[in-house]
From Swiss-Prot:
Role summary: Associates with the EF-Tu.GDP complex and induces the exchange of GDP to GTP. It remains bound to the aminoacyl-tRNA.EF-Tu.GTP complex up to the GTP hydrolysis stage on the ribosome.
Principal location class: cytoplasm
Family matches, as Pfam families: EF_TS (PF00889)
Protein name as annotated: Elongation factor Ts
Name of the gene this protein is made from: tsf
Organism (species): Corynebacterium jeikeium (strain K411)
Record family assignment: Belongs to the EF-Ts family.
Subcellular location per the Swiss-Prot or TrEMBL entry: Cytoplasm
Keyword Ligase found: no
Amino acid sequence: MANYTAADVKKLREITGAGMMDCKKALEEAAGDFDKAIEILRIKGAKDVGKRAERSASEGLIAVSGNTMIEVNAETDFVAKNSEFIEFADKVAAAAAEAKANSREELEAVEVDGQKAVDALQQLSAKIGEKLELKRATTIEGDKVAVYMHHRSADLPPAVGVLVAYEGDDEGAAKAAAMQVAALKAKYLSSDEVPAETVAKEREIAEATAREEGKPEKALPNIIEGRLKGYFKDVCLLDQPSVTESKKSVKQVMDEAGVTLKGFKRFEVGQA
C-alpha cells in the first residue's frame, strides 16, 4: 500500500515542476518523506541536465527588450512555444537590457528572480526536460531603435529579430529597413563598413572570373568595378534595392523619409 496520497503527488508536482510519474517514484523511494522526495527529484534533475548538455539545442526564440536582443535555445519547437519558456526569455531579455548585455557571458550573468540567469535556466531545463541554452546577446546604441520580429509560423515565437538604430521622425521607414534586414540578411550598413581585405578578395574574384570568361583586357577595370558594385548591393543595406520601392535603393528611400540609419543587429535562431 502506498504511503503517500494523490494530494502529496499534486503538491510535489507544484513545488518541483516534475512529471507525475517522477513524483510518484520519488515518494515511493522516500517512503512518503516529502522533503526527501524533493531532494531525490533535485538530484535526478541535476543528473538529467548533465545528460541533456550533450544534446543539441537548435530551436528557440529571439526576445527583445529596449535596445537589447537575445537568443535562447531549446531542443524542439514544442518547447520553444512553451509559455513558461517564453516568459523566462522575456524576463532574461529585460534583465539583459538593464545590464546592456553584449555577450553570452554577460547574458548568463544577469539576475533573474534573485539568481543568475544561467542558474535559473538550469532549473527550467530540469523542469521541462530539454537542454536549454542562453546563446547570445547584443545591445545597440541609439535613442531611437526600430524593431522587427519575424515568425516562421503563426504558432511559434519569433525566430528572427532585427534592431535598427536611426535618426529622424519616420518610424515606419525605419521599421521597413528592419524588415529588409530580416529578409535579405545584409551584413553591413554601407560599403564603408566592408573590411578592406574583403573588398580586395572580391576584386580578385571578379578579375579572375572575368579573365576566365575571356573578357578583353581593356574592359577589365570597368567589369571589376561593376561586379564589386553588385557585391555591395547584395551585402550592404543602404546599397540594396528597397523591398518597398524596388526602383530605389534603401538609402534613397531613407533620404526621402528624412531618416538616417546608424546601425543594425540581426539574430536568427540557430545561426551564428
